[in-house]
UniProtKB/Swiss-Prot annotation:
Main location as per UniProt: membrane
Topological domain ranges for the Cytoplasmic compartment: 1-48, 132-149, 204-214, 286-297, 340-367, 411-421
Induction profile: Transcription induced by L-cysteine (in vivo), under control of DecR. Member of the dlsT(yhaO)-yhaM operon.
Knockout mutant characteristics: No change in sensitivity to excess L-cysteine. Cells produce about 15% of wild-type levels of hydrogen sulfide in the presence of excess cysteine.
Family, similarity comment: Belongs to the amino acid/polyamine transporter 2 family. SdaC/TdcC subfamily.
Organism annotation: Escherichia coli (strain K12)
Bilayer topology term: Multi-pass membrane protein
Record function comment: Plays a role in L-cysteine detoxification. May transport both D- and L-serine.
Protein name: Probable serine transporter
GO molecular function: cysteine transmembrane transporter activity; transmembrane transporter activity
Length: 443
């Protein structure tokens, strides 16, 4: 039913414009694609194309193309659905300042701090991974190309200075972060696409391999599922993105529409590019090269440089440096945004138990979080902890934070019952598979 107003005719309540209390013309004006939308698409792609993408073809080569295809059939649709549900559960929340406050609004303060802590642990692991990776890799490249005589990473202060610079950039606001990330992310995307295309001339059908027995196929597909998902996963940026849109837009419907649109665009670009890249590398590289890369603990790019001769090898070497550094830097920015938001949620949850909310100095809290993030990242750098060995526990955390918790909210909160359906069952199954995947890998 349409209702007349001084701004025009309000659209039918069954449409997004109607739910937002707007006319169709007002709705079209409100959802216009702008620089902020572009920025969040860029940040999401930057988060997804992290350091792990250079190892994806190795995992696919080890397990076989059939395993990857089955894993993709399960993983990519499920990932799209659970990221969509994650956005919807955040956007529906009456209070949308940070992830723990959203959970608190739905389930109470105790659940908010418990599930917020789980989300926090996931982001701490990635803070460890990316802060250590960017310190060691940048120092290694500077030494390799003769810029420095020794490794700068041997000095603890190199890592401290580097992290301070990255955190300072990340904390200056979205506009600066979007500007810095745009060039790096577009370069990464073009590099990944170019690498996939460059391998087409070396495709061999025998690298497709034979179809393995059903039991082994399913088991290996579940083991490969975390690698498939994390190749284009950007759940770490979804919470800051929704919160940003909610703070900018008066209408929840407009904020939800813009967040979902940014996610859809990023997902589509990532799926086409990364899926082609992984399949192209597998058809060119094959199982034997993947085993060699695994045994030498090197990336697909490094092994490609070994079997590509002539000028192509030099090109792959240069490209690998660009992809590696840009991938780690932009992923660090995305992780830091999520880490800052999660930490703020936990701190505010604790402080509100001790004092009235109006007496809390949020600026002081944010400065404290910056210092905490720097010290946390620096401690990982100084200890040079084998953080990559910790990343396997991220699969169950992704399963819980991205799939099982949003699904539980749908069943628990009456306002979210509208999201029940077959897609929710697929999300739940995927969440359970992510939780058991590490145990199958080591069985």
């Amino acid at each position: 039913m349409e209702i007349a107003s001084n701004k025009g005719v309000i659209a039918d309540a069954s449409t997004p414009a109607g739910r937002a209390g707007m006319s169709e013309s007002e709705w079209r004006e409100a959802i216009k694609f702008d620089s902020t939308d572009t920025g969040w698409v860029i940040m999401s792609i930057g988060m997804a194309i992290g350091a792990g993408i250079v190892f994806l073809p190795v995992q696919v080569g080890l397990m076989g193309l059939w395993v990857f295809l089955l894993s993709s059939v399960i993983g990519y649709p499920a990932m799209y659905l659970f990221q969509r549900l994650f956005i919807n559960t955040l956007a529906e929340s009456p209070e949308c300042k940070d992830y723990p406050s959203v959970i608190s609004g739905y389930l109470g303060k105790n659940w908010g701090i418990l599930l917020g802590a789980l989300y926090f642990v996931m982001l701490v692991i990635w803070m460890f991974v990316y802060s250590t990776a960017i310190t060691n890799d940048s120092a290694s490249y500077l030494h390799t190309f003769g810029v420095t005589e020794g490794l700068l990473s041997d000095s603890p202060f190199y890592g401290l200075v580097l992290i301070c610079i990255l955190v300072a950039i990340s904390s200056r606001g979205e506009k600066l972060l979007f500007k810095i990330s745009t060039g790096m992310v577009l370069t990464k995307l073009l590099v990944v696409a170019a690498l996939g295309v460059s391998m087409v001339g070396m495709w061999h059908l025998y690298n497709v391999g034979s179809l393995p027995p059903l039991g082994l196929l399913v088991k290996n597909a579940i083991i490969t599922l975390p690698f498939t998902l994390t190749s284009i996963l950007f759940i770490q940026t979804l919470s800051p993105m929704v919160i940003s849109y909610r703070s900018r837009e008066k209408s929840i419907e407009v904020a939800r529409h813009k967040a979902l649109r940014a996610m859809n665009i990023a997902f589509g670009i990532l799926f086409v590019t990364v899926f082609f890249y992984a399949v192209s590398f597998t058809l060119a590289m094959g199982h034997d090269e993947a085993v060699k890369a695994y045994e030498q603990n090197i990336s697909a790019l490094a092994i490609a440089a070994q079997f590509i001769s002539g000028d192509g090898a030099a090109w792959v070497k240069v490209v690998s440096v660009i992809l590696n550094i840009f991938a780690v830097m932009t992923a660090f920015f995305g992780v830091y945004l999520g880490f800052r938001e999660a930490t703020q949620g936990i701190v505010m949850n604790i402080l509100r138990r001790k004092m009235p909310a109006e007496k809390i100095n949020e600026n002081l809290v944010q400065r404290g979080i910056m210092i905490f993030a720097i010290l946390l990242a620096w401690s990982a750098i100084v200890l040079n902890a084998p953080v990559l060995s910790f990343t396997s526990i991220c699969s169950p955390i992704f399963g819980m934070v991205g799939c099982l918790i949003p699904a539980w909210l749908v069943y628990k909160v009456p306002a979210l019952h509208k999201y029940k359906g077959m897609s929710l069952y697929l999300i739940i199954v995927t969440g359970l598979l992510l939780c058991v995947s590490p145990f199958l890998a080591f069985s």
